Structures are given as C-alpha cells and as structure tokens.
Amino acid sequence: MALAIGLCLGLGIPISLIIGAVIGYYFAGKYFKKQLKENPPITESQIRAMYQQMGRKPTEKQIKQIMATFKKNNK
C-alpha cells in the first residue's frame, strides 16, 4: 500500500511538472506574440525621428513600407 502511494507520487509529480511547463511555454509564446502585434517595438514617430537624424524627410509611403516590414517579420 505504501509502495503504491509512493510510486504514484514519485511519477505523478514530475509528470505534472513537465506537462505544466509545456502548457506554460505554449501560452507564454502566444501572449508574447500578441503583445508584439499590439505594441510593435517601433512606432511611426520613431521612424520619422530616425530619418530626420539622418537628415532626410521621409515620405508617408516609406514610413508605411517600414511598418509593414516590421509587421511581416513579427508574424
């Protein structure tokens, strides 16, 4: 009887930890991708500032093109 309980605990706890780690990793990845999509690492105003620091005036087309590239790479 005591051997059966010990065996159940000895196998159940590590298996539960492994399953929990896999599920946690999956949901953390989904959450991270969602946050990147909602809050990109760079904004249009940052792109404009970068162009101005280089001494150039960006067109709206260039800014949209750079933002589209960032969104495409984040998928």
From Swiss-Prot:
Keywords: Membrane, Transmembrane, Transmembrane helix. It holds the Pfam family UPF0154. The chain crosses the membrane at residues 5-27. GO terms for cellular component: membrane. It comes from the Bacteria. It is a single-pass membrane protein. It is found in: Membrane. The keyword Repeat does not apply. Belongs to the UPF0154 family. This is UPF0154 protein MYPE400. It comes from Malacoplasma penetrans (strain HF-2). The lineage of its organism: Bacteria, Bacillati, Mycoplasmatota, Mycoplasmoidales, Mycoplasmoidaceae.
